Amino acid sequence: MSTDLIIDGFVLGHSTVGGDDATEAILSMYEKLDRPDISFLLISGIVISLYNIVDVKKISEKIGLPVIGVTYEDSKGIEDAIKHHFPKSYDSKLAEYSKLGTREKITLRTSYDLYIRNEGCTVSEATHLLDKLTLQGSVPEPLRISQLLANTLLKAKF
């Protein structure tokens, strides 16, 4: 979706539940798009598919664009949950998670709070972009449309 909110394409991908391939899956989707006009990447959630951690810094460095990971609620962290679900291999997941750093709380012009991790842009630039892309509520339009499409595909019976 472009910043003028025109939908101009989709790409689909997947990552392994409980795996370590979310970052590579996102990079693969970016490459499949083959679009030179992309100017930023938004990701809804940085820890997806049962603790499959997205490395926003690596993605930003590889594609040379700003990457903004968006979450909608404050949390106390997931360290204990990672230890619980991965008792024999939690060290590597915790190391990957700690590399993400802390989230920044921002308030949109809609008065909703978001929590972001940003690479390749400042918090101020990320806030400006998210304000522009959020028409109502807390979910920026590109992420809202992506979630609608994903939910529809999950429910579809071909």
Segments from the language model and where they lie:
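Charge-patterned, long linear interaction tracts outside catalytic cores
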Residues: 118-158
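Loop/helix-junction capping segments adjacent to catalytic residues or to phosphate/diphosphate-binding pockets
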Residues: 20, 49-53, 76
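Ordered, amphipathic secondary-structure segments that act as subunit-interaction surfaces
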Residues: 31-58, 63-71
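Structural signal for hydrophobic packing residues in well-ordered secondary-structure cores
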Residues: 30, 63, 86, 134-137
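N-terminal, Lys/Arg-enriched amphipathic/low-complexity engagement segments
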Residues: 1-19
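Glycine- and other small-residue-rich loops at beta-strand/loop junctions that grip anionic moieties
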Residues: 15, 45-48, 115-119
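Glycine-rich, highly charged phosphate/nucleotide-binding loops
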Residues: 18-31
